[in-house]
Amino acid sequence: MQVTSLAMGAVPVPERQSSPERAANSGRFDPSLAVPLTWFDRPTLDVAQALLGMILVSVVDGELVAGVLVEVEAYGGPDDPASHAARYRNGPVQAMWGPPGHAYVYRAYGVYPCCNVVTEPEGRAGAVLLRGAAPLVGLEVMRARRQAMRPGQRLLPDERLASGPGALAIAFGIGLEHNGIPLDRPPVWLQPGGTPERVVSTPRIGISRGQHLLWRFVVADHPAVSRRGHVE
């Protein structure tokens, strides 16, 4: 995996296939294949890069959906001015302090749920925001969930169903009720997928502080990336 703009050290990852599509077709979407929670017990930037190409799976209201992660953002603890952990400690944000491998779900603008994966050893805040996924299965379920939030608007193309953090959470049926759940079992889990050929790092989107940090990671040239104009 080639990373442009920000050099990182070697990142150990679970066994992967050569491509996300091959990974999806070679086995089941099964929680027995989930990435173990201990895998997330390490630096946030390492986890953020390694999440790209992994498969996010949810079974909510009996509906199975899955997609390949193509865009994420890393957020640190109190020293990261853009992090919720720098401003809050009580309420849903408590999930950012661990344990690792659990969900931190909050509502953006009071409307859209956003899903993060908690990182770092328990007691040290850190999380990776899931910003975009390329749908693999359950596309019509995703589309119905998205269209319910935008009645009367044109149908979304497949690559935009889970493009953007709010869109991803809605498409996968993730809400505030999932804050703090472990992400190695139903209703939401992560499985090893493929390894992207090239990953690009950029400034994070929609923040007013910490813009100099290149902590947004995307699969280069992927159509499901939420704001491709921000890829440099």
Locate each region found by the language model:
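Conserved, well-structured core segments that form or line functional sites
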Residues: Q2-E232
